[in-house]
């Protein structure tokens, strides 16, 4: 166990270390102990269960830090990589957007398009960034206009820690230093959208874009075409851009979607109504005059 600091790490002594057994159906603690003065620990499992994996966790400054899963069946000794814990701070350090990937699908039968975004959020400081309340997230970013049906996806940041408010996606999960944390979410673009814009509201080191409509036109600063990529028997035009600055725009000119006869219904009704009105006026003009009564 190690305690992370601004420039180095030190042993985390006397920390309570818990080993958990995890399967697809359930998870729970198996055993625990305290780390020694050098931050080391040794937990003996007499009958390791090979039906799942084991993870080691440690609590520090109100947060749990968890190791990578290890398989315990059939091996007398398993090494677990060091877990590095950090002190927590509110409103700092800043969280950087290291990479953004957006995948834009073809229109559905309803004319809407599904977009999946994967972001990599990076904490370059020496403490774990946490939130004070539900009003001040640990990170926030703009989402495109003419979109809806937002939902969080799988990644390092749980969907339960993601909120969508007005024109923004908000993250309330703690973000620790080290490797960038992956955030994913999806949404639908309104039917009939011809120009789809990804707004850039903060410095973005790199952006990758996949567009299933390979005839779409993409405009962005420092844009490079990466050819066509095949993913699960679907073909996408690939692009990269960056670095990007606040105020930059990624514009995608989309081709017209599928023809939907129901989209013409309002116009058909209007034409029929106009035709009926003309017929009524014509009929009134053609109606013979009333016969006069003779005295």
Question: PLM ranges: what are they?
Answer:
Residues 2-294:
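Lumenal/extracellular ectodomains and adaptor appendage modules
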């Amino acid at each position: 166990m190690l305690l992370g600091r601004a420039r180095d790490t030190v042993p985390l002594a006397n920390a309570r270390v818990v080993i958990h057994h995890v399967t697809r159906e359930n998870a729970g603690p198996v055993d625990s102990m305290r780390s020694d003065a050098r931050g080391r620990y040794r937990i003996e499992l007499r009958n390791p269960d090979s039906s799942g994996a084991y993870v080691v966790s440690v609590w520090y400054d109100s947060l749990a830090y968890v190791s990578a899963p290890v398989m315990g069946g059939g091996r007398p000794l398993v090494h677990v990589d060091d877990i590095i814990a950090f002190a927590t701070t509110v409103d700092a350090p800043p969280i950087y957007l290291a990479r953004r990937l957006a995948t834009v699908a073809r229109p559905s039968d309803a004319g809407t398009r599904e977009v999946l975004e994967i972001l990599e959020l990076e904490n370059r400081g020496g403490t774990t960034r946490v939130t004070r309340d539900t009003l001040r997230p640990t990170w926030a970013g703009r989402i495109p206009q003419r979109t809806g049906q937002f939902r969080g996806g799988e990644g390092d940041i749980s969907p339960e820690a993601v909120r969508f408010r007005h024109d923004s996606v908000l993250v309330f999960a703690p973000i620790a230093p080290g490797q960038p944390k992956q955030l994913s979410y999806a949404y639908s673009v309104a039917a009939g959208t011809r120009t789809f814009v990804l707004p850039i509201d903060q410095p973005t080191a790199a952006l990758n874009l996949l567009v299933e409509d390979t005839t779409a036109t993409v405009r962005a600063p420092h844009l490079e075409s990466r050819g066509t990529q095949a993913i699960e028997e679907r073909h996408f035009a690939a692009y990269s851009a960056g670095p990007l600055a606040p105020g930059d725009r990624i514009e995608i000119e989309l081709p017209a979607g599928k023809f939907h006869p129901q989209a013409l219904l309002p116009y058909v009704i209007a034409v029929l109504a106009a035709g009926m009105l003309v017929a009524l006026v014509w009929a009134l003009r053609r109606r013979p005059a009333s016969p006069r009564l003779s005295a």
